[in-house]
Amino acid sequence: IFKNSQNALRLNLLNFAAYVKIMPDYKSEKVMDYKKYISEKLAAEGISAEEIYSSIALPPDPSMGDYALPCFKFAKVLRKSPAVIAQTLAQSFPADGVIERAEAVNGYLNFTINKGALARETIDGVLAAGERYGSSAEGAGRTVCIDYSSVNIAKPFHIGHLSTTAIGSALYKIFNFLGYKAVGINHLGDYGTQFGKLICAYKHWGDREEVEKGGIHAINDLYVRFNSEATEQMEQEAREYFRLIESGDREANELFDWFKELTLEYVKGIYEKLNVTFDSYAGERFYTDKMGPVVDELREKGLLKESEGAQIVDLEPYGMPPCLILRSDGASLYATRDLAAAIYRKKTYDFYKCLYVVAYQQNLHFRQVFKVLELMGREWAKDLVHVAYGMVSLEDGAMSTRKGKVVWLEDVI
């Protein structure tokens, strides 16, 4: 382990010089590409600096030196044995304080650099670069979409939401730092029958003044109460309220928009504390009018099949269960909305990569969605990446907002 750590540290130090050259705001004549330095010093008749540069490697053992040049490939050109070539080059290598030692060993020329000089150059480079240290322009002209946090409307942040939020925000900042145009997307969970339940609960037990005062936690209390006390009649009312939302009913949508406004006011306060930002809050509802064309395309391309009344894409040939596109009642599902979202994002942002920072339990879901897009002829499906992570659970099992079994994030931060 110690040996591997030494190698990693050595590799990082030795490559600092070359790496820092691609930093947009940092230039220093002191920063050196040691491989280039060695190859230019050794270039001779019959051996170009380019050939030497491409041959230089890191020795397997740090005790052998920091760089090694195998001389075997030069034997034919120079008409000498590798050992003689290495010895001759070692004797002629200039001692100027950059390279501490050049030693010929069994046909190899091993170099040990001056660590004191390297340390000074590295520190000078870090100080000169300041906050830009480690940045680059490698992503210039490329866009990376990152779907993370993706909160549910009317549900407070619990500790489990921190993983996707922190990982996604870190990736967002890293990609920006590397010169990419990062697009942070908060794919709001603002679609589903639960909002019919919430409106029903509010109609039965809610008070506007109390909800305004209690904010998102007051809304969540209503949702929890519905799930523990709702009668069959209330369940039917909830389904009807959701239908009203979908059909554009003014009162139902005004209530929903109010819940959404309270939610965003709350979550943006959390994001501010965490120093997390987003460029888009386009949630599931945003894609309502964009799912129809996706379903039509699937049907036109012969990918859509009926199974027990539902519309599916058969993925059995690819080792996966079918991807459900429409339920038997014609309602859309997560996959339908994610297909529409991916197509919209490609059209809008022309991304180089699109990352989904979502728990590992959704591995199958994303494999299915990516495969369906591939079958639809979207060659960019290969640029979709599921960044999976483990779920956070309590001692007595998984958290559940519906059951009120959670640890709120604001109580932790």
PLM regions with names:
Residues 36-37, 43-77, 81-413:
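NTP-dependent nucleotidyl-transfer catalytic core
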Residues 7-15, 43, 179:
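Compositionally biased amphipathic helical and low-complexity segments enriched in hydrophobic
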Residues 3-6, 21:
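Charged/polar low-complexity intrinsically disordered segments
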Residues 10, 15-28:
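Short, positively charged and aromatic/hydrophobic N-terminal segments
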Residues 24-38:
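Active-site-proximal helix-loop elements at catalytic-domain edges
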